[in-house]
Each structure stands twice: as C-alpha cells, then as structure tokens.
Amino acid sequence: KDMLDKPMFIETHRLAEFNPRGTDVPVVLDLMIHDIDIILSVVKSKVKHLSASGVSVISDTPDIANARIEFENGCVANLTASRISLKNMRKTRFFQRDAYISVDFLEKKCEVVKMKDAPQNPGDFDMILQNAEGLKKQIYFDNPEIAHNNAILDELETFADAITNNTRPIVTLHDGTEALRVATMIIDQF
C-alpha cells in the first residue's frame, strides 16, 4: 500500500472455480465485495458514476459480474468477479503516474514497474525510455515480498485485539458499510 500514490486506473479479477455451495449469495457479495473494499481504501474518493452487468449461467443470481466505477477524483476501477471460471485468480493491477503495480493475492506475488528521471550517465544495462518531448525516464523493476499469512485469521485477530484493547479496528464499521453500499449499487444495475 505504501507504493500506491493516487492510482488513476485499477483493474481487478477475482475468479473462482464453480462450487455449488454459495450460489444462494450474489457473486458481488460473495467475491467482488473484497475488491470493492480494497479499492475504496486506496482511492479515498466518492463514487461519481457506476455501471455494471452480470450474467446468471448456473444459478438464479449472476455468476459472473463486471462493474466500472468512476470516482470524483478521476480514478476509474474495473472489477470482474466470477464463480464459474476454469481456474482461480485473485489479481489487482494499479496504474498511476510513473508506475504500474500488480498484486497476485492467490500466488502472494507483487510486481512493481516504476519510471524515474533518467540519470545523466546511464549504465549499459539501464533501461531508458524517451518520450516525444525528449524527456528521458529510467524503468525500475521490483518484486517486493508479500507475507504468506492467513488473511481471515489476521482479520479476526485484529478485530479481537481492537475489542480487547478498545482501539479502532483496521477495517471500521464505516468501511464495511461503504463497501456494502457500493456492492448494492452494483447489484441494483442487474
């Protein structure tokens, strides 16, 4: 999260193989809501416009859904959730000025591509790009470590800790209700 600086386009794919358990819950509330919560915590702006579509393939509610959320600060998020995929995927990509950040939540991998002003005397192996105006940028690649932990266990432990120590939880009631409000707006589009 420290690497994110006003992303302007966010793309998420949360795809799951079919499991008959859970088809009574809309895919937006079962899967997409996690990405809605992440995006709202990163963007920190109000929803300006939302459009969505969903298709019921196996169950009575949409099994696959896509939503496009436009925020007041200009950021656009495109979210896809499916419970009828052939393989599992949990990826989010952030695009911001001079950086691209890809997070694979399933494989616990992160890829960061950043551009910075090029040095006066670049090395032989430095990757330098030059735009139409002649501005030179150097490309840097990074693969920061992602802790291999149990997200649900961590969430429950921090919640219990907030109760025990009378502190503010990491994810507040407001955060949860806002994610649910946006999820409901998406479902209302179907």
Task: Show which residues each predicted segment covers.
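C-terminal glycine/acidic-rich active-site capping loop/insertion
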Residues: 98-170
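Basic phosphate/pyrophosphate-binding loop/patch that engages nucleotide-derived ligands
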Residues: 1-8, 72-73
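C-terminal helix-rich "cap/oligomerization" subdomain common to oxidoreductases
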Residues: 72, 153-190
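Conserved catalytic core of Hanks-type protein kinase domains
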Residues: 3, 42, 162
